[in-house]
Amino acid sequence: MPHRGWTIPAGHPNYEVNNTYEIEEDIFLLSMGPHMHYRGKAMRYELEYPDGEREVLLWVPDYDFNWQFLYEYEEPKFIPEGSKMHMSWWFDNSEANRFNPDPSQDVVYGPETTDEMANARIYYAPTTPRGLVVGEQIPDDIINRAREEDMIRRERADLFDPAADDFSWLTEDSP
């Protein structure tokens, strides 16, 4: 889940970026993977249950771009529909950050390591079986529903460009 549309001011030692994602169905959370670049300082995943109770799922207080881990649960964690995943990232764009390529510049989201990212990978499985069996053909209704759900997620994340990605590449024989 990338989060865009923010600018880290030049010289700022502790800039905070926040995003929230609503869980739309019951899921089993399998793992999480924070991702930032050289100015990344800390990252937190916090879950708000439908009843308002909150739980910190992952806190990485000393993020290091060179040590990006995928944090896995020993047993999948059940998360009910309607829960909200609150994600917070902190960045150090100051001269005190020895990894900072240029503390005199404002920084925005971008693909280069000299840009920044506020990404929160989550890997999960639905609790309800999808009706997919290894080795059997995937029914058209499941493929169509997956395409629709993917477009909704991309639009919500401001990633979908219909002109660039029309799913014409997707066929039954796709790997």
Annotated model-derived regions:
Residues 1-131:
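His-enriched metal-coordination microenvironments in redox/metal-binding proteins
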Residues 132-175:
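Activation corresponds to long, low-complexity, non-globular regions
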